[in-house]
Amino acid sequence: MKRPRSRLWYDGLENTPHRVYLRAIGFTSDDFQKPLIAVVAAWSEAGPCNFNVLPGSLRVKEGVRSAGGVPLAVPTIVVNDGINMGTPGMRYSLISRELIADTIEAQVASHGFDGWVGIGGCDKTQPGIMMAMARLDLPSIYIYGGTAEHGVLDGETVTVQSAFEAVGAYLKGLIDEERLYEIEKAAMPTPGTCQGLFTANTMAILAEALGLSPLGSASPPATSSERARELARAGALAVGLVETGLTPRRILTYEAFYNAIVTLMAISGSTNAVLHLLAIAREAGVKLALDDFDEASRKVPVIAALAPAGKYTMVDLHNVGGAPVILRKLLDRGLLYGEAVTVEGVEIGKLLSKWEPRTDYNILYDFDKPYKPHAGLRILRGSLAPRGAVMKIGASGILKFKGAAKVFDSEEEAFKAIERGYVEEGDVVVVRYVGPKGAPGMPEMLKITAAIVGAGLGEKVALITDGRFSGATRGVMVGHAAPEAAVGGPIALVENGDEIVIDGEKGTLDVLLGGDELARRRDKWSPPPLPKQGLLRKYAKLVTQADEGAVTH
């Protein structure tokens, strides 16, 4: 079997000391003749999303061995997004994406691996692994650790989204503490990632659309036997990739990224996917810009009623066929590049011929009768965000909003204002200095958005920020405003009472101020100081703006 890299580390008399190290952990002479496969486990017990990744890595190793390879497990880090919402820890979420890519590069590049498998779960582990795949360009495959089962309370589906929104309902007096506690206990009955079409499940589906994951591998729940089989299959496929020499950059063409973008629009996926696809494309050397997302958003309606746009979860999608059923619909509509190659070594169009298109008008809809007549996301530009912003419209359906600004320089300020009833119907809440450099780390605003929705203001108040949104976000929400406040973007110049106009149909985002007034305010503006030390300071100095994927190189 082929061993393009490991032979350079472990063959020959001069590499005798290297073999000593592996014999110390149980290698036999036969093992040195087999492909060496890294099993990169983004594992952590600090939350449910990646809790099952370590035992899952054992399944991957079984698959590697079954195909004639030798697996070695190596770790990478995890920051659990949900647990860090609304805390200082959320600043480390997006930063962890870069750290994951960097740590994988360091480990896989330096130990002579012939190929590797990355196992992810929570939001940033997935794009971090995919960025490393593109950067290293070694035979590799991404496999998802799987979603959690949804809970049931009084016959109704509940998820972690229900818990976040219940806090807002409690603060508004709409539910009591006992009901809040019942939701807390019921919302997440098993390990796995957050259950709706939030960032983790969005990225797992997009990994299939990109061709980096086997078709059908995104939707099996984390604790299911199907998930175990998918993990083992990924290990075996990795050995095959070493043999054929198929690498990520042959898969990650512009056409593959376009397939992912139209899928994102059709499922009303997380706004975070825009950042992540831009970042992965940069690693792959593919030119991708917000204009590509804008173009796709004007062609594709939402055809899946998945939470938060609808009420169904990833497990529900799995029960009707999973991501390939949606991809087949896109292919049949002429919206997917069927000739794009996948990690299975076969064009995606040929693979999708095995899946029958399905419509039930509960979870899955048709293009002629879509769930929503527009795409899930829209790109906005204007005087408030000259380089672009991302509007999530799949959940609310509201494309236009005009109101007076209420401005906050932190998430905590905004949350306290909502808590005390300061935010009212018709307001445009502006949360700034929470961008890539400003926070730093571009934290997600789920605590605020959930409080707004829970208080019954989801479609009556708009939120604009240079930060990010959780995939669980719904309401009238515009994020990723670029340039951000910390570098002097127009969002830094907005004052309380300024009229702001959001127009998702035209794709515009404007503050109704003259150029002279903006210039006067800019003369008085000064940049905030950088963090004094550590990782946050390093990140703030290196990171690019959101329209470039918020990357560090």
Curated annotation (Swiss-Prot):
Mg(2+) binds at residues 81, 123-124, 444. It comes from the Archaea. The active site is at 470 (proton acceptor). Its EC number is 4.2.1.9. [2Fe-2S] cluster binds at residues 49, 122, 194. GO terms for biological process: isoleucine biosynthetic process; L-valine biosynthetic process. Disulfide bonds: none annotated. Binds 1 [2Fe-2S] cluster per subunit. This cluster acts as a Lewis acid cofactor. Transmembrane segments: none annotated. Pathway: Amino-acid biosynthesis; L-isoleucine biosynthesis; L-isoleucine from 2-oxobutanoate: step 3/4; Amino-acid biosynthesis; L-valine biosynthesis; L-valine from pyruvate: step 3/4. The keyword Metal-binding applies. PROSITE patterns: ILVD_EDD_1 (PS00886), ILVD_EDD_2 (PS00887). It catalyses: (2R)-2,3-dihydroxy-3-methylbutanoate = 3-methyl-2-oxobutanoate + H2O; (2R,3R)-2,3-dihydroxy-3-methylpentanoate = (S)-3-methyl-2-oxopentanoate + H2O. One of its GO terms (molecular function) is magnesium ion binding. The keyword Amino-acid biosynthesis applies. It is an enzyme of class 4 (lyase). Its cofactor is [2Fe-2S] cluster; Mg(2+). Belongs to the IlvD/Edd family. Homodimer. HAMAP family: IlvD. This is Dihydroxy-acid dehydratase. It comes from Aeropyrum pernix (strain ATCC 700893 / DSM 11879 / JCM 9820 / NBRC 100138 / K1).
